[in-house]
Amino acid sequence: MTTQADPLRLDSMLCFAVYAAGHAFTRFYKPRLDALGITYPQYLVFMVLWEADGITVKALGDRLFLDSGTITPLVKRLEARGLLRRQRDDEDERQVRIFLTPEGRGLRAKALAVPLAVGEALGGEAADGDALRESLHLLRQRLDAAS
């Protein structure tokens, strides 16, 4: 006789597995980002800016799935530390663009060790991580579409 998994059993919940993995990532990243003097959300801001310096605040929020009420204080704290600067768009003054300062750009070299440490900790093949990341992107897209 086979028993069907209880759909309300915690360990059978996909959402709990993702939630628990998120917490494990946070614990793993914290000491590494503390050494850089930044938090995980700030790290994400830098990752976007290292790809697209001069992006608008709105585009940054869209890229990170965060609203302006979350992005603005994050950006202001980094600006106060001299790691980035905000500037009104020359063509549309309603838009604010975010630019890295030399100090913010310089943080990239130190941050390169973080994803390398993640890869080491996860072990396995790079393709495994790529496949998992793609599955998680698809999961987010499907949940967004169903919301």
Q: What do these predicted regions represent?
A:
Residues M1-L36, D130, E134, Q141:
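N-terminal leader segment of winged-helix/HTH proteins
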Residues M13, L44, Q95:
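Amphipathic alpha-helical recognition patches that constitute DNA-binding helices
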Residues F16, H23, R27-D67:
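N-terminal helix-turn-helix DNA-binding core of bacterial DNA-binding proteins
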Residues T26, K76-E134:
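Charged, amphipathic alpha-helical coiled-coil/dimerization segments
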Residues L36-P41, T70, T101, E125-A127:
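Short helix-coil-helix linker/hinge
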Residues V57-K58, G69, K76, V96:
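Residues within helix-turn-helix
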Residues Q141-S147:
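Generic C-terminal helix-cap and adjacent flexible tail
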